[in-house]
Amino acid sequence: MSALQFQRQLGIKRYETAFLILHKIRAAMVRPDRDRIGLEWPVEVDETYVGGKTKGEGQGRHHKTLVVGMVEVMPRKKALGPDPNLSSGQRPQHQGGHGRSFIAGRLRLQVVPDRKQETLEPMVLANVQKKAEVRTDGWTGYDNLHGLGYKHIAVPIRGDQAKTDKHLPMIHIVFGNLDAWLLGTHHGVSSAHLQGYLNEFVFRFNRRFWPMVGFESVLKIAVQVESPTVQNFYEAARESKDPTKPVPIG
């Protein structure tokens, strides 16, 4: 739900108030003690640029924000196992996968400043279990993953759609869904607050088989995390105007 729609439905006078409330909720969508993915299943890792083309600037990416994504690839029949956020006796509401034998498992998304090795390696270390099988597109930023204790499988893709569909299908499905969600629901977002929207997308994605437990999960997490303040958001907005940093997108 966009802040504008939220404002209208609740009858909130100021848009800024609705915006702040939603971001406080998004702050409660990331468990501070969440575990790393890839304990049982391979993990696809790739990056994408989020944001639209700036008018008159062709395909230039300096007005886009770089996001790294990591997603488990798991057998479809395993997708409906127990969820740590479910109360005892609850069952998932629906299945997914559209007939595929493998589907996307747990997801992580993170805004990053660049594609350098010193940026990407810490992202993998923080989110993916050691000894996990990690699949990438051959980008040099991941060259040392084997030395860090991962089973690294790199396949140079270089824009080949057939190779992408075969080697990294799930993360690119995720990226497509993310773009559609940001544009369709929020009509584009500011780079200053993009991570909050990514957190919401990941929260919804990881609970898509249990949509009715989202509220319960947010309440559990909310008592563990610090809520952002108005000052936090104004500081983020000021930083986004720095010409050396991403500017609003969408």
Model-assigned labels for residue ranges:
Residues M1-G250:
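Residue-level recognition of single "structural anchor" positions
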